[in-house]
Amino acid sequence: MQTSVHAHGGEADPLPAEPGVRVGVAGALRVLDAPRELPSQRLPGFLLQGDAGMDARGAQLEHGVLDAGWRLHGQWGAYAALGKHGSDPAHIEAAWLQWQPGADWRLTAGRQRPALGAVVTPAGHLDRFALVPLAKQASFGHDWIDDGVQLGWRRAIGRADLTLDAGLWRGRVWPGGAGTPVALSLHGGVTAGDFTFDAFAAHFEPTGRGTRAALAGGGHSHAAPVCDEALKDMVCFAGRSQVLGASARWLSHDLPLSASAAMLWHRDRGPLRSRNGLGDYGGDTLGGWVEGVWAIQPQWELGARLERLQSRQRLQGAGVSLIAAELGLNAYRPANRAALMLGWLPREGIALRLEVGTEAAGGWRSRFAALRAVFRIDDVAAALRGASRAP
């Protein structure tokens, strides 16, 4: 994914302004306390990958990123990022080549994050809040990182900055899966004064997207499980899957306040098949969040985030009660989360945040508290030069 400081800001260019190389590093260390596994770890009752998820409790590396951007000259550049979450192995989050034939156009090919807007794209990692928003988790299995080609257009018209993006993707990650011929994405955004508005659409047509049976477990993965002929501990979906989203952000130039909101709609239509039967499935999952931040003083901020996720699911055919039991769909209850955050920013690139919250899904509720240390260095070489000149 287009990560590190630049990508998590959602809009900044990760390539150096002039020909040369930039190396950056960013990370978040977290200690989270909760009396039991958080409901969002598995999101029971929602159709997802069906894995055991990542246990957020205890002390762990929430996210670490080492990235490098290389601008060959005005038109060509390359970017790569290596990331790590918790005990998961390190993985390539981004590896792409970019061509900019002019000031307005850019063509990016390789592994990257499809454009979803200034609110949705960066939400969830190196964020102000510790946990990935429920709506983003349910729609994309946390983050959408994919291999493909994306064409972008940027232009200032009057007092507004316009953005358009279109992408073609391999589509093997959730909500795509095996057999996806090609996934499509479209994004449009406008920034005018204090406000930014974004909308996006994504379309997948998997022929073998798997979901592990509720009792099968399995390690955490961003990819959709691959179906096989045996269908052992697996339920397979074949059909159309779409995600639509819209978001808004307000960054006041006059007040120490900011606010944002996002809504995502994930729609599935197609057959579900397992050893126990075949059913026609229709699922509509709608979720979103609102967030507000008050900069109490230059080094202190107070924030709150409210979230809700709900789903309407229809399953018809022979043996559908057994399929629903395999998937744990009978455990469905609307999910919600509320969190309050106090942040201390002692210097640029360093933040300490205390967060308390509560969340519910699948019929149970859990409180949690987290202490996080987040750091980010855009340009390691420049930081070292600055440190050497300091008295």
Regions found by a protein language model. Name each.
Residues R42, W76, D88, L107, ...:
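Hydrophobic alpha-helical segments
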Residues R42-G50, L126-L134, G319-A324:
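Short glycine/proline- and charge-enriched loop/turn segments
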Residues E18-L38, G53-G171, A178-L184, G189-F197, ...:
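Outer membrane beta-barrel
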Residues T3-G10, R128, A246, V293:
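N-terminal cationic amphipathic segment used for targeting or macromolecule association
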Residues M1-A56, T207-G210, W300, P346, ...:
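Outer-membrane beta-barrel biogenesis signature
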Residues G53, A95-Q100, D198-E205, R212-P391:
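Outer-membrane beta-barrel pore domains
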Residues P175-G179, G363-R365:
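Short, solvent-exposed loop/turn segments at secondary-structure boundaries
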Residues E11, K84, R170-R172, L215, ...:
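Short, well-ordered turn and helix-capping elements at secondary-structure junctions
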